[in-house]
Swiss-Prot record:
Residues 30-210 are annotated as: Zinc metallo-hydrolase. Homotetramer. It comes from the Bacteria. In the N-terminal section; belongs to the zinc metallo-hydrolase group 3 family. One of its GO terms (cellular component) is cytoplasm. The gene is norV. Binds 3 Fe cations per monomer. Binds 1 FMN per monomer. This is Anaerobic nitric oxide reductase flavorubredoxin. GO terms for molecular function: electron transfer activity; FMN binding; iron ion binding; nitric oxide reductase activity. FMN binds at residues 260-264, 342-369.
């Protein structure tokens, strides 16, 4: 089913509600995607892009219902990747002599995928035009490395529609086509996720290319992307966001992600986060276990952050494989204007944190001090982690911090209530984790200064997840 975009422009693409992996398994398309193809009917009929190769037959069949294929005068391929030009072989089998307009680099890519050098290719460059009748022209603009060497955009005069290729798009599937018809929170989350995970490496190219396009002084009433929505309501809002994201973007946010073998590094991550939050309550802190989290969500949060703390256990004197892989991805994404710190636990050898620090520095992060803990961190070690978080908060602050009352509160509480008054520390008989009444367990909303007798009955050991009944009074404090 086609959808009218504007006047004689129709969307003839394909929705893909089921797709969950893109670029192999490197990008999780949790909200599906769409492959946008557009049919322009003027004195000349133009097809802009096709769809993913897995929908080739369906696409050609649906296109037949819209137009006699022999009446298609021109095909424009803005991008040769298989989710854009995948149906070309099926289509060209029906209309083999139809001219294809694309960049020189696209010919190489198309032949590499489809192996038909005999097709009627026509190379276009920035500023080239194609008259399609009724006083309208297509204007071509090369956009190399946004995000492939062959990429270009196509502008339709008269209707003032920019067919923007991958730029300004998102992997987002909805029965509605236009930006003002869909859930705005979902839409902009997917826009940022798309930019962070796909276009970040090319941020240095985004601003000059947008400036070049704006320099044509052409009105833009709509931006028709290759994936996701068509921007018809205030279409330049997404252009403004791209300019913002391309300018070494950061928010007052810190991302912590880690992998752990025995939960020791998780304990460190939680304590570091506590230290950050108590020192700078304005900063957003997000924690991810890479083994249980969506990798692309982690990378989107890194993109948004002013700094990242990466934690790993030591295994065979190196970092955990999932951490190594994610750091390699961050290296390729070439994040800018961000700080980093490595941390982790180890047993007899602690080489992973040092290797991790080196890798983060190689990835372009400005490094802060790292932190190591041997074996399972005890209360003293966890306090060092909290202090590390406090120091990170101070070093990475974007504005003067509010005066902390933490130390004052602790001192006042200590003078009024001694540790002895709070009762003994309790130890889990299964995993040996120790509950200290003076420190409580903030992750379960048990405030510092809560004696064991007042800890809720639904309390679970943070390490082994067993209940209060497995706890015993710490042997060293038993009377």
């Amino acid at each position: 089913m086609s959808i009218v975009v504007k006047n004689n422009i129709h969307w003839v693409g394909q929705r893909d509600w089921e797709v969950r992996d893109f670029h192999g398994t490197e990008y999780k398309t949790l909200r599906g995607s769409s492959y946008n193809s557009y049919l322009i009917r003027e004195e000349k009929n133009v097809l802009i892009d096709t769809v993913d190769h897995k929908f080739s037959r369906e696409f050609v069949q649906n296109l037949r219902n819209e137009i006699d294929l022999a009446d298609i005068d021109y095909i424009v391929i803005n991008h040769a990747e298989e989710d854009h030009a995948g149906a070309l072989t099926e289509l060209m089998a029906q209309i083999p002599d139809t001219p294809i307009y694309c960049t020189a680099n696209a010919i190489d890519s198309i032949n590499g995928h489809h192996h038909h050098p005999e097709w009627n290719f026509n190379v276009v460059k920035t500023g080239d035009t194609l008259d399609i009748g009724n006083g309208k022209q297509l204007i071509f603009v090369e956009t190399p490395m946004l995000h492939w060497p062959d990429s270009m955009m196509t502008y339709l005069t008269g209707d003032a529609v920019l067919f923007s290729n991958d730029a300004f798009g998102q992997h987002y599937c909805d029965e509605h086509l236009f930006n003002d018809e869909v859930d705005q929170t979902e839409l902009f989350e997917q826009c940022q996720r798309y930019y962070a995970n796909i276009l970040t490496p090319f941020s240095r190219l985004v601003t000059p290319k947008i400036t070049e396009i704006l320099g044509f002084n052409l009105p833009v009433d709509m931006i028709a992307t290759s994936h996701g929505v068509v921007w018809r309501d205030n279409p330049t809002q997404i252009v403004e966001l791209y300019l913002k994201w391309a300018a070494d973007y950061q928010e007052d946010r810190i991302t912590i992600f880690y992998d752990t073998m025995s939960n020791n590094t998780r304990m460190m991550a939680d304590a570091i986060a506590q230290g950050i939050a108590e020192t700078d309550p304005r900063v957003a802190v997000k924690i991810f276990n890479v083994a249980r989290s969506d990798k692309n969500e982690i990378l989107t949060n890194v993109f948004r952050s002013k700094g990242v703390l990466v934690g790993t256990s030591t295994m065979n004197n190196v970092m955990m494989p999932k951490i190594a892989g994610l750091v390699e991805e961050m290296t390729g994404l070439r994040f800018r204007n961000k700080r980093a710190s490595a941390f982790g636990s180890h047993g007899w050898s602690g080489g992973a944190v040092d290797r991790l620090s080196t890798r983060l520095q190689d990835a372009g992060f400005e490094m802060s001090l790292s932190l190591k803990a041997k074996w399972r961190p005890d209360q003293d070690a966890l306090e060092l982690c909290r202090e590390h978080g406090r120091e990170i908060a101070r070093q990475w602050a974007l504005a003067p911090l509010p005066q902390s009352t933490v130390n004052t509160v602790v001192k006042e509480e200590t003078s009024a209530t001694t540790t002895a008054d709070l009762g003994p520390r309790m130890q889990c008989s299964v995993c040996q984790w120790i509950y200290d009444p003076a420190k409580g367990e903030p992750m379960q909303d048990v405030a510092p200064g809560t004696p064991w007798s007042e800890v809720p009955d639904n309390f679970l050991c943070p390490e082994c997840s067993l209940g209060k009944d497995v706890f015993e009074e710490l042997a060293s404090e038993a009377k």
